[in-house]
Amino acid sequence: MSQIKLIVGLANSGTKYEDTRHNAGEWLINEIARQFNVSLKEEAKFFGKVAKINAAGGEVRLLVPTTFMNLSGKAVGALANFYRIKPEEILVAHDELDLPPGVAKIKQGGGHGGHNGLKDIIASLGNSNNFYRVRIGIGHPGSKELVAGYVLGKPSPQDQEKINAAVDEAGRCVDLLLKDGITKATNRLNAFKA
């Protein structure tokens, strides 16, 4: 099992986006930063906000790209190259249309499912999709045409409550992952439903 060395939370930068569904990945990074009592700081050379936590297996970097979502790979690629972090040592948290609110799942590899942030990260890692993901369920609007507006919209209070519960549990599972490995964390998170 690879030791995770970089955890990325995908988001659009700027206050008008911070409460939108597409920023669910950043919500998880904020939760992990809170657990480890660190603050993310803007780092221009990594095109994002960065923090360092000390976990059982060594240093782990947290990253929220401050590029637009579809340029997330620029930040991930810059940081991964600088610290020589391999794709399988990266965990990317992102919003997931194919899971309902209140559910989050860990998986390795797979396509980008139309997610432009994931698409750009795969390209920036030399077309490797071998990184791990935490897929945070946001639900689906029902029709493809509605997706763009939906991901940039805010969840209903009921959905937000469920997403928050899944993000909290995902935060606990990331802590477990850093201590006990990916399998235990995956089994626990993938069984959770708010």
Swiss-Prot record:
GO molecular function: peptidyl-tRNA hydrolase activity; tRNA binding
Record's catalysed reaction(s): an N-acyl-L-alpha-aminoacyl-tRNA + H2O = an N-acyl-L-amino acid + a tRNA + H(+)
Site residues, Discriminates between blocked and unblocked aminoacyl-tRNA: 12
Primary localization: cytoplasm
Example GO biological process: rescue of stalled ribosome
Binding residue positions for tRNA: 17, 68, 70, 116
Site entry (Stabilizes the basic form of H active site to accept a proton), positions: 95
Family matches, as InterPro entries: Pept_tRNA_hydro (IPR001328), Pept_tRNA_hydro_CS (IPR018171), Pept_tRNA_hydro_sf (IPR036416)
SUPFAM superfamilies, A to Z: Peptidyl-tRNA hydrolase-like (SSF53178)
CDD domains, per database record: PTH (cd00462)
EC number(s) reported in the record: 3.1.1.29
Cellular component per GO, a single term: cytoplasm
Pfam families: Pept_tRNA_hydro (PF01195)
Keywords for this protein: Cytoplasm, Hydrolase, RNA-binding, tRNA-binding
Residues at the active site: 22 (proton acceptor)
Record's subcellular location: Cytoplasm
Enzyme class: hydrolase
Similarity annotation: Belongs to the PTH family.
Record's function text: Hydrolyzes ribosome-free peptidyl-tRNAs (with 1 or more amino acids incorporated), which drop off the ribosome during protein synthesis, or as a result of ribosome stalling.
Protein name: Peptidyl-tRNA hydrolase
Organism: Actinobacillus pleuropneumoniae serotype 3 (strain JL03)
Gene label: pth
